[in-house]
């Protein structure tokens, strides 16, 4: 059986959201270049995240062609849920970046005049842009209708993000002190009420 993401119409929906996500990442990267004031706390976690995301994406797409990992009769509902999660992840990530405004950078860097941001999706979790990434990649795994792809696309990006979250939180506590500690005490990292 041909998976939905390879069928006319459904393939356009999948690839449109997929490409929009990565175009949004590149646009954001260039749009926020001017936000890089001060010294980065570190740079290695960006390499870890990029490596895990790139590795997960390439492996997930390759594994999708493995017929032994298909979801069977549930492929269309699983595909639709995947598209919804991809779109939700894209929107949440961009919303979080907009909420951070000039404080957003691609590396771990606390701006000299930075304050704790608790508006937008930061009202509910400490790292909503990463929540968006997790939702997007889980969505890709589901939309590919392949269990092996889902596992790789859920685990690898999340592993990179866990490294990044640890590094970011250490830098935020060092720079913002008790303000960030109070904020962190009232919000979970990625998912409200979970973690």
Task: Annotate each language-model stretch with its function.
Residues 118-134:
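Membrane-interface loop-to-helix entry segments
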Residues 1-111, 115-118, 136-195:
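Membrane-anchoring alpha-helices and their flanking helix-loop junctions
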């Amino acid at each position: 059986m041909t998976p939905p993401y390879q069928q006319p119409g459904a393939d356009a929906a999948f690839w449109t959201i997929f490409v929009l996500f990565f175009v949004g990442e590149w646009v954001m990267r260039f749009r926020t270049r001017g936000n890089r004031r001060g010294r980065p706390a570190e740079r290695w976690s960006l390499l870890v995240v990029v490596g895990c995301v790139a590795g997960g994406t390439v492996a997930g797409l390759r594994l999708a062609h493995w017929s032994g990992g298909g979801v069977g009769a549930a492929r269309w509902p699983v595909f639709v849920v995947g598209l919804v999660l991809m779109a939700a992840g894209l929107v949440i990530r961009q919303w979080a970046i907009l909420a951070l405004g000039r404080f957003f950078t691609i590396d771990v860097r606390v701006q000299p005049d930075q304050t704790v941001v608790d508006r937008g999706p930061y009202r509910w979790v400490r790292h909503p842009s990463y929540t968006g990434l997790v939702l997007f990649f889980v969505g890709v795994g589901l939309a590919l209708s392949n269990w092996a792809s889902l596992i790789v696309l859920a685990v690898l990006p999340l592993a990179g993000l866990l490294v990044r979250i640890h590094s970011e939180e250490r830098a935020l506590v060092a720079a913002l002190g008790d303000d960030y500690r109070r904020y962190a005490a009232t919000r979970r990292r990625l998912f409200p009420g979970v973690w």
